[in-house]
């Protein structure tokens, strides 16, 4: 079996409907997977039922059977029974906290390694990396560890933009990621702009979408990654 994981920067790009831009990216992962489990734990400011309803509506044209993990009495069994795994955006710290709380980290990692398709956007992409140390989110709750699913062996930074508001004196995103690379100079960070995604298929990794990504690693800072780039070397 081969890993088949799609890591989306965001649920929207511009003013497009929820998950609409992601449909062409997600569709290839659904050809042999109809029964999907959605993990809404990153959704702190909405009910899990409402979050699930938004995802079901957003992906309606794919005709998938999507249930929320919160609807199942045994979250671990729900993961075991699923053909595919969806993890949505929101607060990455809360998401990871709940994954640890329900003992899902190793189980999801093993399922994905065995070939179960994985789709994560925003926080759901963050937790697919080595750790959540490069998330943009507020640490509203403390998970037992920052270590994440390790579906890819590097760091991710979704929603990437290095825009600086005129007159604003806070650090840019690039400056924040530089801080990480000073502490962990050997760990790559891929910063993904909205509208783009990383697709891992076994030992291959490619950048999809309409906007470039950026690599931060050691002395390499904000190195442009064009759309369509083969990034398979980062999996080694």
Curated annotation (Swiss-Prot):
<comment type="function">
    <text>Hydrolyzes dipeptides containing N-terminal aspartate residues. May play a role in allowing the cell to use peptide aspartate to spare carbon otherwise required for the synthesis of the aspartate family of amino acids.</text>
</comment>
<comment type="similarity">
    <text>Belongs to the peptidase S51 family.</text>
</comment>
<keyword id="KW-0224">Dipeptidase</keyword>
<dbReference type="GO" id="GO:0005737">
    <property type="term" value="C:cytoplasm"/>
</dbReference>
<keyword id="KW-0963">Cytoplasm</keyword>
<keyword id="KW-0645">Protease</keyword>
<keyword id="KW-0378">Hydrolase</keyword>
<dbReference type="InterPro" id="IPR029062">
    <property type="entry name" value="Class_I_gatase-like"/>
</dbReference>
<keyword id="KW-0720">Serine protease</keyword>
<dbReference type="GO" id="GO:0016805">
    <property type="term" value="F:dipeptidase activity"/>
</dbReference>
<feature type="active site" description="Charge relay system">
    <location>
        <position position="137"/>
    </location>
</feature>
<feature type="active site" description="Charge relay system">
    <location>
        <position position="122"/>
    </location>
</feature>
<dbReference type="InterPro" id="IPR005320">
    <property type="entry name" value="Peptidase_S51"/>
</dbReference>
<dbReference type="GO" id="GO:0008236">
    <property type="term" value="F:serine-type peptidase activity"/>
</dbReference>
<dbReference type="Pfam" id="PF03575">
    <property type="entry name" value="Peptidase_S51"/>
</dbReference>
<dbReference type="GO" id="GO:0006508">
    <property type="term" value="P:proteolysis"/>
</dbReference>
<feature type="active site" description="Charge relay system">
    <location>
        <position position="159"/>
    </location>
</feature>
<protein>
    <recommendedName>
        <fullName>Peptidase E</fullName>
        <ecNumber>3.4.13.21</ecNumber>
    </recommendedName>
</protein>
<dbReference type="InterPro" id="IPR023172">
    <property type="entry name" value="Peptidase_S51_dipeptidase-E"/>
</dbReference>
């Amino acid at each position: 079996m081969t890993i088949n994981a799609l890591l989306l920067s965001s649920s929207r790009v511009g003013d497009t409907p929820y998950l609409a831009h992601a449909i062409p990216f997600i569709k290839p992962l659904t050809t042999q997977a109809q029964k999907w489990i959605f993990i809404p734990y990153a959704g702190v400011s909405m009910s899990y039922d409402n979050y699930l309803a938004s995802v079901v509506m957003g992906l309606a044209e794919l005709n998938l059977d999507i249930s929320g993990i919160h609807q199942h009495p045994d979250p671990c069994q729900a993961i075991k029974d699923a053909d595919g795994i969806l993890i949505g955006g929101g607060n990455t710290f809360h998401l990871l906290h709940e994954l640890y709380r329900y003992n899902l980290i190793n189980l999801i990692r093993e399922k994905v390694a065995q070939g179960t398709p994985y789709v994560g956007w925003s926080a759901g992409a963050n937790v697919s990396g080595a750790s959540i140390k490069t998330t943009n989110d507020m640490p509203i709750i403390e998970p037992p560890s920052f270590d994440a699913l390790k579906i890819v062996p590097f760091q991710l930074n979704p929603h990437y933009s290095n825009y600086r508001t005129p007159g604003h004196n806070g650090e840019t995103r690039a400056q924040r990621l530089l801080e990480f690379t000073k502490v962990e100079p050997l760990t790559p960070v891929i910063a993904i702009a909205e509208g783009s995604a990383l697709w891992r298929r076994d030992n291959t990794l490619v950048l999809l979408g309409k906007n470039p990504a950026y690599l931060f690693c050691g002395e390499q800072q904000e190195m442009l990654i064009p759309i369509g780039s083969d990034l398979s070397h980062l999996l080694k």
